[in-house]
């Protein structure tokens, strides 16, 4: 098995459960409870928790890669900006997905620019809090 495949499998086993759990909860809340129509503000904690989950996932990927020396010998100082940057990328991709759902299917997912920016902020805040917790725990 190639080292890259082993890394991918280890990363998925180690930490993919967190974003998958958040996504499944999100879908169940929509289908089962029509949650965002009933409580539009439910979107705010979901983006925060999503940021925590995706930072956890990228942190697990980073650690699995470091363990296999796929990143060389990364300095510990690189962990926070790399994970926060990847969390930011995931939040932006999610917002693009919401935009496409609205454009293609007519399902209102982004009421206005302020909502989109708050979603991005909450995702980044969730990621930053997880990174801070992880850093303090490992120090």
Question: Residues of each region from the PLM?
Answer:
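Residue-level signature of transmembrane alpha-helical entry/exit and packing/kink sites
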Residues: 15, 44, 75-83, 115, ...
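Interfacial helix-loop-helix junctions of multi-pass membrane proteins
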Residues: 33-43, 92-124, 128
């Amino acid at each position: 098995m190639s080292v890259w495949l082993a890394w991918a499998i280890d990363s998925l086993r180690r930490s993919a459960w967190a974003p998958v759990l958040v996504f499944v909860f999100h879908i169940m809340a929509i289908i089962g409870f029509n949650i965002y129509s009933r409580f539009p503000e439910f979107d705010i904690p979901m983006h925060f928790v999503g940021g925590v989950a995706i930072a956890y996932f990228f942190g697990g990927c980073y650690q699995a890669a470091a363990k296999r020396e796929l990143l060389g010998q990364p300095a510990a100082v690189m962990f926070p900006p790399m994970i926060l940057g990847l969390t930011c990328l995931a939040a932006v991709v999610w917002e693009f997905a919401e935009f496409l759902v609205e454009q293609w299917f007519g399902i209102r997912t982004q009421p206005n620019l302020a909502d989109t920016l708050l979603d991005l902020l909450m995702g980044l805040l969730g990621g930053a809090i997880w990174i801070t917790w992880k850093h303090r725990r490992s120090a």
